[in-house]
């Protein structure tokens, strides 16, 4: 029995080994400057790790702004509890605002990605990022330059990040894994504000604008050059584009077999399992290839976008992301309140967030093999549990909550990106990604109201218990539509498609 279990474990681990075929048509696409796809991926990982959504680790950003004295003039007197000060509340309110701008801009970024290409979209995004740090470097109370800086930070976050996702199409047999690797690199970017904070504390005699301009010249300008010279004018073609001819021939062969052979029981896998999925993929891929090669690309792409936007998987994933976004943003805003009994847990969160790339890569491997829907269900459970365990005033429960928060944050948007890539035509990927982010970002503004309402009537204590329980109940209810999403198998699982294709050919 033990040998049997060990054999199963060994076989499972062997099955999780990742292989990529360099001879696939998608892997042979021409790259800017003819750079090898692996070198391009490495550069993109560095680009992402240093300039992606750095404000997602809000605890570190908040500490940086507090240390450099942003909004310190709002404090009329000293506060024993910093979380009750006007300065702290003003800084905290920047988070949902920036996130709302970030995800609102995503819808425009999605259209730019699909219609003017990754290169120019990323250039615009890095331009916004540079403007953001220029405004943050200005120290004045006459104009709220901090607010303006975070507006540009929100505008540039996805505009600089989404275009680089096209690199995943150079690895067609592991594209979702590559997408989560890029997402893991984005998790590494959480270390940027903590690093800047460390530098500021290490060299307190340096003005803050030295640090801001250092970040601009050392990181952001090289990233702008990467966007200019190493990103393509048009997105790299997705897997569905290259699968069309093979799937059409497979479909025709199956039809010929079904007409010539009257014994249906001799071919159950073709009739019962394969035919529906293949026909659905053929229809989707026909749309992708015809739109890309057609004369009315922009019009047909937009029409297809509105068609798939009203489908069940699209609506379900948007509703889930709205709830997930509210939950994660609210958690980030109340960490000091959740763990006021033990501040060391907050320090642990600051350590866990930069290393959240590790679970992100692990989740990415499972997504590539089993699809994103099952990981989304797991993240739904983690989101409910991280709030409930945070309410238990015990160190062990607090550590569990911090770990669950790290896991949820590690695959924050990658879970959505991978599902959209697997479930919908690649020709509308940017627009679907953008509209999903738009809804998530707009509703994140609700977190500001939630934070303002967690103070009790005495006004000297914050209690997030009621809101946390309501969020947990919402996630429990969300299990039903997500389970339907999973059981209906909307995704095009890359590894399953390849294995089924090999079986049919055999």
From Swiss-Prot:
Q: What does this protein do?
A: Cationic amino acid transporter which transports L-arginine, L-lysine and, to a lesser extent, L-histidine and ornithine. Plays an essential role in gametogenesis.
Q: Which SUPFAM superfamilies match?
A: MFS general substrate transporter (SSF103473)
Protein encoded by which gene: NPT1
List UniProt keywords, sorted A-Z.
Amino-acid transport, Cell membrane, Glycoprotein, Membrane, Transmembrane, Transmembrane helix, Transport
Keyword flag Signal:
no
Gene3D superfamilies for this protein = MFS general substrate transporter like domains (1.20.1250.20)
Q: Which family does it belong to?
A: Belongs to the SLC43A transporter (TC 2.A.1.44) family.
- Please tell me the species this chain comes from: Plasmodium berghei (strain Anka)
Keyword Transport assigned: yes
- Please name the InterPro entries in this protein's record: MFS_trans_sf, SLC43A_AATransporter
MF GO annotations: L-arginine transmembrane transporter activity; L-lysine transmembrane transporter activity
Principal location class: membrane
Protein name per its UniProtKB record: Cationic amino acid transporter 8
Q: Which residues cross the membrane?
A: 38-58, 93-113, 116-136, 147-167, 174-194, 211-231, 302-322, 344-364, 372-392, 399-419, 427-447, 466-486
**Glycosylation, residue list:** 2, 5, 75, 277, 325, 342, 453, 456
PANTHER family given in the database record: PROTEIN FMP42 (PTHR20772:SF2)
Q: Where in the cell is it found?
A: Cell membrane
Q: Which GO terms describe its cellular component?
A: plasma membrane
Q: What's the protein's topology in the membrane?
A: Multi-pass membrane protein
- GO biological process terms on file: L-arginine import across plasma membrane; L-lysine import across plasma membrane
Phenotype upon knockout is: Growth is normal in asexual blood stages, however uptake of arginine and lysine is decreased. Impaired production of male gametocytes and fertile female gametocytes. Rare gametocytes that are produced have unusual membrane structures (whorls) and large vacuoles in their cytoplasm.
